[in-house]
Amino acid sequence: MNLEEEAKKFMQDKLIITEVMTAEFYEMKASQTAIFPKNQALEYLALGLTSEAGEVAGKVKKLIRDGADREDYELKKIAIASEIGDVLWYCAMLATEVGVPLNEIMKDNLKKLHSRKERGTLHGSGDNR
């Protein structure tokens, strides 16, 4: 599938679901497509997440390397968005696997980030800052 076909498919797929998208709804719908070995679910999902994140990085790298005219740039951004969707799927399935709803992870992450911002510790490294 070439880049233009991939972009068209992504846009068509976006139009199928018309409900308001929530993390809970996404997690439920995504889990209906989950086919992987349940006895190694955590490992499988973590490796899948890493693989898909690598695909995002690869597409961004090629965009930087090759440059693009405006039309090609927009198509490549759509392809990147499609890969981000795959990353999201793995995040949702990992959340399900560890037994914490995705929306709770999202809320907790925002609380953590806002706390760091208020304390001036967004920069730096380490989980406990």
Where are these regions (language model features)?
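Flexible "arm" and connector segments at domain edges
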Residues: M1-I84, L88-R129
